[in-house]
C-alpha cells in the first residue's frame, strides 16, 4: 500500500472504522494528535494519565527518568481482518552502528562494534538503554519481556515505519490524516477519502 501509494483498498476504510470507534468511545486523549515527543510521553504516560501508548520498544528508555518503576507490558497489534497481516508481522530497524566508507580504521571500528554488541557488553547496552539486545542469546530487559515474545514470534518483517518515511508526501499524508482521525476531525470515510488524494 505505502510502497505503491495506493490507499484505495477496503482495508483503509476498515482501519479508519477501528480508530474512529476508539475515538468516539473516549479511548484516545483529546490532545493525541498534537502530542510531540517528549511532552506526550512524560505528561501522559509517565504520570499515569494514559493507560496505553501506541509506540515502540524504545519508549521505556525514553521515559525511564520520569517513570523508573513503571510496570511495562507490550502487545502486538492484531490483524484487522483474516486476509491481512497479524501479530506475526512487525517492522524492525530503528538504530544501527555504521562505519564511514572513508575510514582509515574500518577494521578496528568493525571489531569494536562486534565487541560492543556481543556478550556482556551487549547485555549491558540493552540493560542500560532498556533496549533490544543484538545477540539472540543475550538477556532482555525485564521491561521488554512481552516484546521479546513478539519479536521471537515474528515471521514477516516490514521495513522501518513500514516504508512510509521513504516518501515525504506519503509520510505527510499518513501523519496528517491519522492525526485528524484519532481526534474525530475525520470520520472513517473522510479518512479513507483523504488517503486517496
Can you say where each PLM-predicted feature lies in the sequence?
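Beta->alpha turn/N-cap motifs
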Residues: 38, 55-60, 77, 93-95
Amino acid at each position: 500500500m505505502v510502497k505503491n501509494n495506493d490507499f484505495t483498498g477496503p482495508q483503509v476504510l476498515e482501519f479508519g472504522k477501528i480508530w474512529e470507534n476508539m475515538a468516539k468511545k473516549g479511548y484516545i486523549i483529546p490532545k493525541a494528535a498534537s502530542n510531540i515527543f517528549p511532552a506526550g510521553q512524560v505528561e501522559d504516560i509517565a504520570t499515569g494519565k494514559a493507560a496505553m501508548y501506541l509506540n515502540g520498544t524504545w519508549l521505556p528508555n525514553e521515559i525511564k527518568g520520569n517513570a523508573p518503576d513503571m510496570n511495562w507490558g507490550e502487545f502486538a497489534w492484531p490483524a484487522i481482518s483474516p486476509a491481512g497481516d497479524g501479530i506475526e508481522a512487525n517492522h524492525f530497524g530503528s538504530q544501527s552502528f555504521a562505519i564511514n566508507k572513508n575510514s582509515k580504521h574500518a577494521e578496528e571500528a568493525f571489531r569494536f562494534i562486534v565487541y560492543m554488541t556481543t556478550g556482556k557488553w551487549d547485555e549491558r547496552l540493552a540493560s542500560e538503554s532498556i533496549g533490544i539486545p543484538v545477540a539472540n542469546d543475550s538477556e532482555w530487559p525485564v521491561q521488554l519481556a512481552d516484546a521479546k515474545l513478539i519479536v521471537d514470534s515474528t515471521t514477516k518483517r516490514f521495513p522501518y515505519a513500514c516504508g512510509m518515511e521513504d516518501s515525504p508526501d506519503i509520510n505527510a499524508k499518513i501523519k496528517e490524516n491519522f492525526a485528524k482521525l484519532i481526534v474525530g476531525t475525520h470520520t472513517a470515510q473522510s479518512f479513507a477519502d483523504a488517503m486517496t488524494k
